[in-house]
Amino acid sequence: MPQLSPMNGLLIMFSVTLMLLIVLVINHFMLTPMASPLLASHLKTKKSGGEKLYY
């Protein structure tokens, strides 16, 4: 297995964190227009295995 240079590792970490950040931002903006009770119930279903709907 080729050893990654510190720069490559940093680049990979940066891209991964950037992707996660983008996903979080998109989720946030998609959920914002909803009413707060809807948001609460949505988060509850998401926690209780509602993730299946997203994949």
Swiss-Prot record:
GO terms for biological process: ATP biosynthetic process; proton transmembrane transport. Keywords: ATP synthesis, CF(0), Hydrogen ion transport, Ion transport, Membrane, Mitochondrion, Transmembrane, Transmembrane helix, Transport. One of its GO terms (cellular component) is proton-transporting ATP synthase complex. The chain crosses the membrane at residues 11-31. It comes from the Eukaryota. Its main location: mitochondrion. It is a single-pass membrane protein. It is found in: Mitochondrion membrane. Mitochondrial membrane ATP synthase (F(1)F(0) ATP synthase or Complex V) produces ATP from ADP in the presence of a proton gradient across the membrane which is generated by electron transport complexes of the respiratory chain. F-type ATPases consist of two structural domains, F(1) - containing the extramembraneous catalytic core and F(0) - containing the membrane proton channel, linked together by a central stalk and a peripheral stalk. During catalysis, ATP synthesis in the catalytic domain of F(1) is coupled via a rotary mechanism of the central stalk subunits to proton translocation. F-type ATPases have 2 components, CF(1) - the catalytic core - and CF(0) - the membrane proton channel. Belongs to the ATPase protein 8 family. This is ATP synthase protein 8. It comes from Albinaria caerulea (Land snail).
